[in-house]
Design a protein with these regions (language model features):
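A structural micro-motif recognizing beta-strand termini
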Residues: 30, 43-45, 59, 81
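C-terminal structural segments of small proteins and small subunits
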Residues: 55-88
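A generic local secondary-structure boundary/capping motif
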Residues: 14-16, 43-45, 65-68
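Short alpha-helix capping/helix-loop boundary micro-motifs
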Residues: 38-42
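N-terminal first-folded block
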Residues: 1-32, 37
Length: 88
């Protein structure tokens, strides 16, 4: 999993049918915890807001964890961090 901060959102009017109704957020991995990533787009099924720190699952864990096993999803916000001492 990646620890990141939600920095924006993405609107997509044309997308796979399996992604209809999904919210897309731009997540910036926390600088000292990132794996050479600058920003990723993740689906958000829990209602994260811009500025919040989140947990992001990737790959099959993202799809299974969000119940979208057959959707073209590579990253999903699976948790909002309430207390992130030392994140910045």
């Amino acid at each position: 999993m990646i620890v990141g901060k939600v920095v924006g959102s993405v609107v997509s009017t044309r997308k796979s049918e399996k992604l209809i109704g999904q919210k897309f957020m731009i997540v910036e991995p926390v600088h000292h915890m990132k794996a050479d990533l600058s920003q990723i787009v993740a689906i958000d099924i829990i209602g994260a807001g811009i500025g919040e720190y989140v947990l992001v699952a990737q790959g099959s864990a993202a799809r299974i964890g969000c119940g979208v096993e057959t959707a073209p999803v590579d990253a999903a916000i699976v948790g909002i961090i309430d207390d992130g001492a030392g994140l910045e």
